[in-house]
Amino acid sequence: MRHGKVHRKLNRTAEHRKAMFANMAASLIKHEQIVTTLPKAKELRPIVEKLVTLGKKGGLDKRRQAISEMRDIDQVKKLFAVLAPRYKDRQGGYTRIIKAGFRYGDNAPMAVIEFVDRDVDAKGQDSGPVQEKATEAA
């Protein structure tokens, strides 16, 4: 019987799953759109929805709960300062999952998970080292 088996294990230990979803939630809040496998996106959605609800409730205790869940203080600040006011009138359903074909190599089903009414400019922002074009000194 599969009674009580609510979440997917994703072939990872409990610690690995928790860390992975904390990192994925921080990435989704930072970029407001990420590409991942479909099962991971489906498991990430309720985590992020609950984080946005924490942001909407506000308060120091909710901020500390979000920090313990996500472990990225900069993204918690964005959650409470940017995302919470954006979704203050929306009762849930802050994210959407769009199927994005299959990954080359292992044929894994891929998906895009993104915030509804997302900021298009946030995608790819501060996503790692960026080479700046060297200006020629004449």
UniProtKB/Swiss-Prot annotation:
GO biological process, one term: translation
GO CC list: cytosolic large ribosomal subunit
InterPro entries: Ribosomal_bL17, Ribosomal_bL17_CS, Ribosomal_bL17_sf
Gene name of the record: rplQ
Keywords: Ribonucleoprotein, Ribosomal protein
Similarity comment text for this entry: Belongs to the bacterial ribosomal protein bL17 family.
Organism name: Nitrobacter hamburgensis (strain DSM 10229 / NCIMB 13809 / X14)
UniProt-recorded name of the protein: Large ribosomal subunit protein bL17
MF terms (GO), sorted A to Z: structural constituent of ribosome
Pfam families given in the database record: Ribosomal_L17
Domain of life, per lineage: Bacteria
Keyword Ribosomal protein among record annotations: yes
Record text on subunit structure and interactions: Part of the 50S ribosomal subunit. Contacts protein L32.
